[in-house]
Amino acid sequence: YWKEDTKTLEEAQQNKIDHIVKKLNIKDGQKVLEVGCGWGGMIFEIAKQKKCEITGISLSKNQIKYCQEKAKELGLDNQVKFDLIDYRKVKGRYDRIYSVGMFEHVGKKFYNIFFKSMNRLLKDNGLFLLHTIGVVDSLSTPNKFINKYIFPGGTCPSFSQIISPIEKTGLIVSDAETLIRH
């Protein structure tokens, strides 16, 4: 997300958010779900830009508490909500679903369940966006440090490892983008 005129990490992060918001093509009044909301950066930015109802989910009590407090502080608590819940237990249907930086934690043996869950939650003609750190070669040796300290139980997948479980759910890949330099 380092465009030619990007000078700081904050600018690069904003470029990433703007890029994702553009791809999501959120319309006023739509219901949006972020799977793995972290500290709320994406949700708060989307809420500032779009008139939609956004739910963020996480398994971290600290993240949810922080996000709820930050939403009140920003005056966005009527537009956004945060739930401490596993993606497999979420109810409802959404026009847009996105996940940024969470899929690495899912683990290969749960890919089918993950994409089935996204398909179940997505309204007809809805859009799901997945942003993940990946590897170029699915046969490459996993990085022991990353597997132990960064994504324990998870992995950085290759595109080929992601596409098969997506296709099995009936989701359709309409766009795939590799952003090598960021």
Annotate each predicted stretch with a short phrase:
Residues 112-124:
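A short glycine-rich, Lys/Arg-flanked "PGG" loop and its adjoining helix->strand segment in the class I
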Residues 67-68:
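Conserved SAM-binding loop
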Residues 1-23, 27:
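Conserved Class I S-adenosyl-L-methionine-dependent methyltransferase catalytic core
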Residues 125-133:
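Conserved beta-strand signature within the Rossmann-like core of class I S-adenosyl-L-methionine
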Residues 39-51:
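Conserved SAM-binding loop of SAM-dependent methyltransferases across substrates and taxa
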Residues 29-36:
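Conserved class I S-adenosyl-L-methionine
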Residues 88-97:
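A short acidic, Gly/Pro-enriched loop at the edge of an enzyme's catalytic core
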Residues 134-182:
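Substrate-binding/catalytic lobe of Class I Rossmann-like enzymes that use SAM or dcSAM, i.e.
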